[in-house]
């Protein structure tokens, strides 16, 4: 650490950016993030994740929010992850401009590379997320 404490300030700033990223991802207040995340995954892992989320990968200007969402949704699909984890990133992707047509095209493309079982599992979650949103929109 330097004498002027800049490493400490950078660490805090990175943590604060991570907290902001998780608050946006999970639609909770920034004040809730550290304790809720630590309760879910343990304090040591939570702290590492907060630091990582505040790093350059999540804020680099070379990727738009839409592109970042597509990359994360692709990574989750490749790993066969669905449910709440995928739903959370689908919601964030929609906020970044991904619509059902774009996500369907993405899954169709991925099916040829990662296989239909994984792509169709993700597509079921995508379809369900748009169906439930459409139903709640028409109920209002």
Predicted segments with their positions:
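Amphipathic alpha-helical segments within well-ordered protein domains
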Residues: 55-58, 87-94, 107-111
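Short, structured motif recognition centered on aromatic/hydrophobic residues
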Residues: 67-76, 86, 106-110
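Short helix-coil transition sites and intra-membrane helix breaks within transmembrane domains
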Residues: 62-63, 79-84, 116-118
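Extended intrinsically disordered, low-complexity coil regions enriched in Ser, Thr, Gly, Ala
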Residues: 82-102, 119-130
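Substrate/cofactor-recognition hotspot
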Residues: 69, 114-120
């Amino acid at each position: 650490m330097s004498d002027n404490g800049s490493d400490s300030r950078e660490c805090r700033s990175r943590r604060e950016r991570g907290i902001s990223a998780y608050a946006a991802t999970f639609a909770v207040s920034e004040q809730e993030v550290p304790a809720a995340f630590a309760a879910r995954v343990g304090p040591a892992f939570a702290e590492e994740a907060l630091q990582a989320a505040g790093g350059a990968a999540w804020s680099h200007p070379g990727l738009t929010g839409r592109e970042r969402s597509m990359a994360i949704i692709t990574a989750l699909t490749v790993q066969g992850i669905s449910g709440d984890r995928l739903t959370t990133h689908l919601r964030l992707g929609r906020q970044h401009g991904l619509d059902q047509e774009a996500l369907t095209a993405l899954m169709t493309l991925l099916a040829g590379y990662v296989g239909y079982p994984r792509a169709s599992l993700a597509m079921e979650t995508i379809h369900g997320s748009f169906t439930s949103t459409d139903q709640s929109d028409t109920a209002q």
